[in-house]
C-alpha cells in the first residue's frame, strides 16, 4: 500500500512539474513572426481581458497558440497587471519578455515635432501625416475640438506649445494635443509670473498673442527683446503695430507668398495696418523665448525696425531714421558678389 501511494504521489508531482517545466521552456523561446517581418505592432484597448490579449497577439500575426499564452499570463502571476497600449513585438521576443513588456507598460513610442512659429493649419497637417496616431481630431471642427479638450469657445491658434512629443502607436491625437495645450499653459504662466513693469500687455492671453507676433517677426534670437520693445512701445502710445505676419495670417491660405500694397489695405481682423491694438488671437505657436520676450521687452524708445537682409534687424526711434534704414537695407541695391 505504501509503495502504491508513493507511486501515486510521484506521478502527481510529475503531472505538475513536467508540464510546468515545458511551459517555462516554451515561454523563453522566441516567438515566430511572419516570414520577412522584423517586428509587429500590437494594440491593446483599455479593459481588454488576458484571454483577449492573448488572442490579439495571435491576430497581430504572431505564430502562437492563444490558450498557451493565456496560461503563461496566469502562471507567471502577471495576468492582472497587463496594461493597455501600443507595443512592438520584435524578432527574438519571447512570450516571457512580451508578458513583462505588457505588464510594465513598455509601449512602443513614436515622436511628433510641433515647430515654433507653426500656425494651427500646419499643426493639423502634421497630425494628419502621422499614421501612427489615431486621428480622432480630423473629423472635428475647431470648435468641437477645443470643446473635446475642455476649452470651449477658445480658438486653437497658439494654444499648443511647440516641442517634440513622444506617443504610443495607436494613441489619440487628442491626447497629444492635450499635453501640448497643458505645456503651453505651464510655460505661459511661468513667463507671466516674471513679467516686467515695462510690459504693456494686461493679460496672459494678450501676452500669448504678442509672443506669436514676436515669434514670426524674429530672424535672429538676439533681436527678440528689441522687437518686443518696439511692439510694447507702440501699444503704449496707441500706435498701430503694422506687422506683416499678422496681415499675412489674415489673408489665410490664399496668400501666395507676395505681400502687396493692396493686401495692407485689405481690412481684416488681423490687419494691424488698418486696426489698432493686438489681433483677436495668436497667429502662430510661440516658443519659450518668444513668450518671455513678450513680457520682458528690452528697455528702449524704438518704434520701428527693418530687416537688414542677414536675419538681423535695424531699430529706429524716429520715422526719419527708419526711412533711412529702409533705403540702406532694402531699397538700395546690394553690391555685387566678389
Task: Pin down the residues of each PLM region.
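N-terminal start-of-chain detector that recognizes signal peptides
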Residues: 12-17, 60-61, 84-86, 136-140, ...
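Short low-complexity stretches enriched in small and charged residues
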Residues: 8-12, 39, 79-81, 118-121, ...
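Bacterial extracytoplasmic/cell-wall-associated proteins, especially those involved in peptidoglycan
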Residues: 49, 129-134, 147-338
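N-terminal type II signal-anchor transmembrane helix
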Residues: 1-39
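Signal peptide-directed extracytoplasmic domains
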Residues: 25-191
Amino acid at each position: 500500500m505504501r509503495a502504491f501511494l508513493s507511486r501515486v504521489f510521484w506521478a502527481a508531482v510529475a503531472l505538475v512539474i513536467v508540464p510546468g517545466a515545458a511551459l517555462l521552456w516554451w515561454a523563453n523561446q522566441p516567438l515566430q513572426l511572419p516570414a520577412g517581418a522584423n517586428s509587429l505592432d500590437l494594440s491593446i484597448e483599455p479593459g481588454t481581458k488576458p484571454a483577449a490579449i492573448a488572442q490579439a497577439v495571435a491576430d497581430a500575426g504572431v505564430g502562437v497558440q492563444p490558450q498557451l499564452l493565456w496560461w503563461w499570463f496566469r502562471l507567471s502571476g502577471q495576468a492582472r497587471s497587463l496594461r493597455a497600449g501600443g507595443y512592438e513585438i520584435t524578432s527574438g521576443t519571447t512570450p516571457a519578455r512580451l508578458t513583462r513588456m505588457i505588464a510594465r507598460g513598455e509601449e512602443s513610442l513614436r515622436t511628433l515635432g510641433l515647430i515654433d512659429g507653426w500656425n494651427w493649419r500646419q499643426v493639423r497637417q502634421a497630425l494628419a501625416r502621422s499614421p501612427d496616431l489615431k486621428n480622432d481630431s480630423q473629423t472635428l471642427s475647431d470648435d468641437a475640438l477645443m470643446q473635446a479638450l475642455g476649452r470651449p469657445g477658445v480658438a486653437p491658434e497658439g494654444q499648443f506649445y511647440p516641442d517634440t512629443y513622444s506617443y504610443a502607436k495607436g494613441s489619440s491625437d487628442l491626447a497629444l494635443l492635450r499635453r501640448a495645450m497643458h505645456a503651453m499653459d505651464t510655460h505661459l504662466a511661468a513667463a507671466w509670473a516674471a513679467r516686467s513693469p515695462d510690459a504693456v500687455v494686461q493679460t496672459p492671453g494678450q501676452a500669448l498673442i504678442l509672443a506669436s507676433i514676436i515669434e514670426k517677426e524674429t530672424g535672429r534670437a538676439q533681436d527678440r527683446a528689441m522687437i518686443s520693445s518696439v511692439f510694447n512701445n507702440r501699444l503704449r502710445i496707441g500706435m498701430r503695430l503694422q506687422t506683416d505676419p499678422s496681415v499675412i495670417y489674415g489673408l489665410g491660405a490664399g496668400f501666395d507668398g507676395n505681400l502687396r500694397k493692396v493686401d495692407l489695405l485689405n481690412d481684416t481682423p488681423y490687419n494691424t495696418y488698418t486696426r489698432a491694438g493686438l489681433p483677436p488671437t495668436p497667429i502662430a505657436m510661440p516658443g519659450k523665448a518668444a513668450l518671455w520676450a513678450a513680457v520682458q521687452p528690452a528697455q528702449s524708445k524704438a518704434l520701428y525696425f527693418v530687416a537688414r537682409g542677414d536675419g538681423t534687424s535695424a531699430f529706429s526711434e524716429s520715422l526719419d531714421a527708419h526711412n533711412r534704414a529702409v533705403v540702406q537695407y532694402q531699397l538700395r541695391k546690394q553690391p555685387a558678389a566678389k
